[in-house]
């Protein structure tokens, strides 16, 4: 009887130890474990949004250069698929804010939220003009400044009501 209890206890301890040591504590564990990400090339995140023109920035964030960002809307639904892919991805052009990347003109997004970021204004309107297949309305002068100001105002009020789906 004592030998059977000892055997059961030893087996339970071994299985517990095995479970603790083999765990990977972030959702998309790459091949080779969590420290192997430095050796891997980052792929572009999944396309999303109208016509697949955007890129996923998080499980509920889809941003496109010409369209802005969709947070928690139908356009961002495809981004939930990123959670099930085995390799990490990266969207955006340059780093900004605290752990984010420039997602659209004047907008910096991390995998959880987006904020207005002045350093992300540069380059986006030039990029959209350079694209021959672009069918978006181009903004210059006062219209552009008004749109950017509205984005900034929306970013400052973001913390007030973060549960509602929004489009930037």
UniProtKB/Swiss-Prot annotation:
Cysteine disulfide partners in this protein: 24-29, 45-89, 48-62, 56-79, 63-69, 96-108, 102-120, 109-114
Glycine amide, modified sites: 32
Domain of life from the UniProt record: Eukaryota
N-terminal signal peptide: 1-23
MF terms in GO: neurohypophyseal hormone activity; neuropeptide hormone activity; protein kinase activity; V1A vasopressin receptor binding; V1B vasopressin receptor binding; V2 vasopressin receptor binding
A Pfam family per the record: Hormone_4
Glycan-bearing residues: 135
Swiss-Prot/TrEMBL site (Important for agonist activity on V1aR/AVPR1A) positions: 32
Family the entry assigns: Belongs to the vasopressin/oxytocin family.
Main function: Neurophysin 2 specifically binds vasopressin.
Assembly and binders: Interacts with vasopressin receptors V1bR/AVPR1B (Ki=85 pM), V1aR/AVPR1A (Ki=0.6 nM) and V2R/AVPR2 (Ki=4.9 nM). Interacts with oxytocin receptor (OXTR) (Ki=110 nM).
Protein name: Vasopressin-neurophysin 2-copeptin
Organism: Rattus norvegicus
Gene, per the UniProt record: Avp
């Amino acid at each position: 009887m004592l030998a059977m209890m000892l055997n059961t206890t030893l087996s339970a301890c071994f299985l517990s130890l095995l479970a603790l040591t083999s765990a990977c504590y972030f959702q998309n564990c790459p091949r080779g474990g969590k420290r192997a990400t430095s050796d891997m090339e980052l792929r572009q995140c999944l396309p999303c949004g109208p016509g697949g023109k955007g890129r996923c920035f998080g499980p509920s964030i889809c941003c496109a250069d010409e369209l802005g960002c969709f947070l928690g809307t139908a356009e961002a639904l495809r981004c939930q698929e990123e959670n099930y892919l085995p390799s990490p991805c990266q969207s955006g052009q340059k780093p900004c804010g605290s752990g984010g990347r420039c997602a659209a003109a004047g907008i910096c997004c991390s995998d959880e939220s987006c904020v207005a970021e002045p350093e992300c204004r540069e380059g986006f309107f030039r990029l959209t003009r350079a694209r021959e297949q672009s069918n978006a309305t181009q903004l210059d002068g006062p219209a552009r400044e008004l749109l950017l100001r509205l984005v900034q105002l929306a970013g400052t009020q973001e913390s007030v009501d973060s549960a509602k789906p929004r489009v930037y």
